[in-house]
Regions:
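Structured secondary-structure scaffolds
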Residues: 1-176
Length: 176
């Protein structure tokens, strides 16, 4: 490091996407993609899938999309699926669902008090959600999404095969 100070590594509890369990389906779905140049299909992209570790979805930061996960004082975990569901649970609607405002939302279910875990999503999760999130699917535009998914054509810089396109493939293979 420039400062000559030692770096301290700390382990934090994290949330992971099970890439290992998804690899067979990800490789199967890769066979349906008409790659150009063709060597990417069984080369760079397939090798990236084969060698990928599980994906750490959570980050211990302030700036990013808040993970919609609340934990109860008895240990129950509640993943909230929409702003409407969060309103039903808490009675609170926000103008902005980022930190610190979303962190203030608490609610009770069957006598158990829930607080949001203070984690945010890896930015690649949002990037990988582009095919459906751009249409606000499944909350709106269901027919338009279903008519147009999956995409017929994607143009991207070859370096994004390892990054953006991998995460698009990862998220969408798991969901659809």
């Amino acid at each position: 490091p420039r400062s000559k100070q030692r770096i301290i590594y700390r382990a934090f509890p994290s949330w992971f996407f099970d890439v290992q369990g998804s690899k067979p389906l990800m490789l199967e779905e890769n066979e349906k993609i008409n790659w150009f140049p063709g060597y990417l299909k069984h080369g760079r992209f397939a090798k990236n899938i084969e060698q990928a570790p599980d994906w750490n979805l959570s980050r211990d930061r302030f700036w990013a999309t808040a993970m919609p996960v609340w934990k109860g004082d008895k240990g129950t975990v509640k993943v909230v699926g929409s702003y409407d569901e969060l309103f039903e649970l808490s009675g609170v609607r926000l103008e902005d669902y980022h930190r610190p405002w979303v962190d203030e939302i608490e609610f009770e279910i069957d006598g158990e008090h829930f607080r949001r875990i203070p984690k945010v999503l890896d930015c690649w999760f949002e990037s990988g959600s582009m095919p459906f999130a751009q249409l606000h699917y499944p909350f709106e535009n269901k027919e338009k999404f279903e008519r147009n998914y999956p995409a017929d054509f994607i143009v991207e810089y070859v370096g994004q095969v390892r990054a953006w396109f991998y995460y698009v493939h990862c998220v969408n293979t798991a969901l659809f």
